[in-house]
């Protein structure tokens, strides 16, 4: 299988980022891999600008991964699309001030960070809160239109747009559902590249089967985690992948997509995976878990049906009544 295009996520503050790139070894590894960097904009500091300049001079393509402060929700969703638009404006001023070059803009589509924290601390109570939100929330179309308008605005500035999505967005789309949209504020956006975050660290059981099930339907795949990332109150950190598991996920993903993203650069450096990545034989044979993935697909289809029913309750009720009527009619004919 051919070597895919690799992109590393990096989510560090300006001081830690400057230290990571201080000796030039990380930059050398990125160049050797021909890799891109999706750089989380945790701040718009001079130190971050200096690192971007190093990457520009070395010819390493950089994506500006837009992030908010924790107080503003941290990630992009329908709840924070206005804040993300404001952050993009501030980013543009910073980029122009330091004359920096970026290949794309990344939007991380996740719920507000306090929702993630609440789901971890008290899942029962927060689930009820989200169910109430689904029932009583107004039409999210206006906010969804704002998200599409933001993407159009970014494109008009000459940037490609990447979106980083939970894999469930694929099921929502296939089910023609709006459950994730109305509960968690997660829109399905028409970006230039959608990256499904298929981190085995999220799924301790059947991780490879889940990855394979979704990867075959993806434009690009994110694997990990090798460490790093934001701390969420009440939520334990993601389990760090062993090299053997990261290698498996990379090889599996490369059989399905041409673009693979690794979370995170700092984790790979800390765990001394960079040299192994540089020397990885992409022709190494790996057997896709077809049978377990088929089981995952059945579960996904059932879940999609449930999402459709929640999103179209009247249609679902009419369908049940119709099936019941036909069934009773057939029973009468059989008895006669």
Please state what every model-predicted region is:
Residues 4-13, 63, 135-180, 195-200, ...:
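Aromatic-lined carbohydrate-recognition surfaces of secreted/lumenal glycan-active proteins
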Residues 9-22, 37-50, 70-82, 114, ...:
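Acidic-and-aromatic substrate-binding clefts and catalytic sites of carbohydrate-active enzymes
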Residues 31, 56-58, 155, 254:
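Anion (oxyanion) recognition and catalysis
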Residues 48-97:
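Active-site-adjacent "subsite" loops/lids of carbohydrate-active enzymes
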Residues 78-109, 183-189, 249-253:
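An active-site-proximal structural segment forming one wall of the substrate-binding cleft
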